[in-house]
Amino acid sequence: MSSPEGFGAAATGGGTPTASNTVTVTTYNELTTALSSKTTANSVILVSGTIDCNYFSVQLNNKTIIGLPGAKLRNLQITVGNSTTSAANSGILYIKSGSNNVIIRNLIFEGPGAYDVDGRDNLTNEGTNVWIDHCEFRDGMDGNFDIKGSADNTTVSWCKFTYLKAPIAGGSGGSADHRFSDLIGSGITDFPTDGRFSVTLKNCYWAEGCKERMPRARNAELHILNCYYKTSVSSARAIGLGAGNQGSTCYVENSNFEQIATISSPVNEGTGTAGLIFDNCVRGISSTAVTGLNYGTAPTKPSYTYTVLPVAEVAAYVSNASCGAGATLQVSSTGVISTNCPNTLGVNDNVENLDIKYYPTLIDNILNIEFSSIENGKAVIEIFSPNGSKVFTTSKNVTGNEKLELNIANITRGVYICKVQIENRVKTFKILKG
């Protein structure tokens, strides 16, 4: 994604990196100086290497933070047996209330491990119009990434959440295993100006070690799209939706709950109402549909424009170690971003529209696809069922103005999604098989 989709789509951060607006930081002092700066010269911050951090709270406006390959912000401070000291020294970055238009991409955030002492998170956001993309969050003391307070209009895309360190018991909070990843709304009376935290979670991966809060939310308007859940924690619980006093909705779409003990754990709290729906979601590679978990008044599908991966492809792409969720982007020393990903729907950062015509509207046996005069190359045509299963695929080297006649007589009647792709040019459309 070269720009955010979803509730955080308005985020532009500090703009495109240039020689005049970009600074590279390698130390904690350089990082905090650049974060605090309001000058144009520090609008885009490139993070290089591993930086050991203390907790830093800052108001950010029109700011972009990008990690160069392997960049990491970490705070490993912990004093087991001393809850007060551990809590005081915890946390990495807190985006304060009043922050607006912030982008953070391709960074690893690492904490000391889960320890229930009422400590801080690796990252906490109270800003508006925020895009967090291709980041990896590991071993937060209290949590990995929380959204609360005045935060609103946030998109979290291609992020990975994990716990690689064993949880630490005996903290003052009482939980022996506090690997609770992501909280949206800190209490039933915590909400932004318009009453609900509007958050899009797209192509995210809750991975090994996560136990709860994937996410836990109240007073929220959530869209969970193309996300992947795989953690061997025996008692793990994914989505915990509470109403809060303002009410909550959660639209879960084309997501794969491959390995998770409990997919949904409704929370009875507050004076509002809650509604959750699972649309075309599955449990693992067997593509067993997620059913029987909807409740409340069904939320409507978000009205904003967004791209969708077929659910059958979510596991492969989101968990891909070299081009999936996490800090997997390629970033040059000047801040130019690229990706290792193949040119696939929802994955490529630079997808363009393919110039084609297709007909008829109601197909009996033959689907006709006509390529314009400017199109040539290897065309890959794939057809997916509504649950994301691939039912047809073919490829052919085409030239300008060529027409393909595809015999799809063996496909059963119904609605399908067709994707046609030549290099980084893609066209997707619905077809009706009669």
Predicted segments with their positions:
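Loop/turn elements at helix/coil->beta-strand transitions in domains of secreted/extracellular proteins
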Residues: 40-44, 100-102, 128, 152-153, ...
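Extracellular beta-rich repeat passengers
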Residues: 216-343
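Acidic Gly/Asp/Thr-rich repetitive segments characteristic of extracellular carbohydrate-active
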Residues: 3-45, 391
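Long, polar low-complexity repeats
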Residues: 63, 72, 163-166, 175-253
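Low-complexity, Pro/Thr/Ser/Gly/Ala-rich linker/spacer regions in secreted
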Residues: 1-2, 337-353
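All-beta strand scaffolds that present successive hydrophobic residues in beta-strands
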Residues: 65-67, 102-104, 130-133, 154-159, ...
